[in-house]
């Protein structure tokens, strides 16, 4: 799904994966990234929601929200797919138009009012200032034009980030890129891939840890002469 037109094999694999999660009674929240076709990704989203699979493909002028209850009360999950200033401005008058990615994200966040007495989680797919990237990968920021100041997310108890392939925390332990499950370039050969697990109890009591992934076929770098490698 690193493309707006994923292969039939990728679609079938995602379908099988979502079915397995549904059979385990796991709620799923999905958002579109910068490589995705948001309209295609969200096809049938209303039907999927009946199975607790919530897909947000496009920004529609307001943050999508899904609330789940546990023993500590409600957790509000806000979904913000990849946005550009133009995506936000189409819902604004010319006098209200925003400039820059930080302003665009900030405006999108202001479309909802958070209950600070309850737990709030946001899913976002943006390039946060200070992120460490793989320069050979597809997530390079050119000139910092699409950088977003991570402080715009300060009111959220956890910030689940996508876009960057390398797993890492930004600004605080509860703001994290989970990274990709597989390596997409040789620049990631020495990167340990993992799954990020968040243990969220009552408000303010959140623990974050990771479980390493071991691929069936790893990416390795071999340096030698052409003749010796052959």
What kind of region is each of these model predictions?
Residues 2-31, 35-230:
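Extended recognition/assembly regions associated with phosphoester-bond processing machinery
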């Amino acid at each position: 799904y690193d493309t707006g037109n994923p292969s039939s094999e990728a679609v079938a694999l995602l379908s099988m994966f979502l079915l397995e999660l549904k059979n385990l009674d796991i709620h799923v929240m999905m958002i579109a990234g910068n490589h995705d076709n948001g309209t295609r990704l969200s096809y049938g989203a209303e039907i999927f929601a009946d199975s607790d699979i919530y897909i947000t493909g496009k920004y529609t002028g307001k943050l999508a929200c899904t609330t789940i209850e546990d023993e500590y009360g409600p957790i509000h999950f806000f979904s913000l797919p990849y946005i550009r200033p133009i995506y936000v401005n189409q819902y604004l008058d010319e006098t209200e138009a925003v400039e820059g990615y930080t302003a665009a994200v900030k405006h999108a966040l202001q479309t909802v009012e958070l209950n600070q007495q309850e737990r709030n989680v946001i899913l976002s797919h943006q390039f946060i200032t200070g992120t460490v990237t793989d320069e050979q990968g597809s997530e390079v920021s050119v000139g910092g034009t699409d950088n977003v100041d991570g402080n715009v997310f300060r009111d959220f108890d956890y910030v689940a980030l996508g876009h960057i392939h390398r797993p890492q925390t930004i600004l605080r332990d509860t703001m994290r890129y989970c990274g990709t499950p597989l390596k997409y370039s040789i620049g990631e050969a020495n990167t340990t891939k993992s799954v990020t697990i968040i243990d969220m109890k009552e408000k303010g009591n959140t623990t974050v840890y990771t479980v390493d992934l071991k691929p069936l076929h790893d990416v390795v770098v071999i340096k030698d002469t052409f003749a010796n490698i052959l």
